[in-house]
Amino acid sequence: MNSTMEAKEIIKEIVGKTEVKHVVFVGCGASKADLYPAKYFLDQNAKQLRISHYTANEFNFATPTSVDENTVVISASLGGATPETVEANAIAKDKGATVISLTRIVDAPLTKDADYVIYHGFAENYAAKLEKTGYCLLLAVELLNQVEG
């Protein structure tokens, strides 16, 4: 788990260890919505990567068979304690996926099964409310650039 790395470094480290073929975005409510712009960006630009976007419970009860060691799961939970998203991280980890989580609370339950954690300042001020979406977009851009060139 690492919260000091930038998106570019995180993706570089992941791509150095595994051949990324599938990116899955997982969350509930507003956090799921905050992941959507990155999913849309990859849908429109990726030619090789498989892209999925699930509510956490959908992921938990109908986990795609394609989730494996070549999958990056990007999860988000504002406070890091949404039970369904915490469970989704555990399931993804059990399937061998690399998990990147976005939250604002250090050592939240969401971070337990995450390989990488990005903390955002959602509660600090109005402008910070876009940080979660922004960080997720940075991850998507880096995935596209480093996986597909």
Predicted regions and their residues:
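Glycine-rich phosphate-binding "P-loop"
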Residues: 1-2, 73
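A short, well-structured juxtamembrane/interface segment
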Residues: 2-19
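Glycine-rich phosphate-binding loops that contact phosphosugars or nucleotide phosphates
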Residues: 19-149
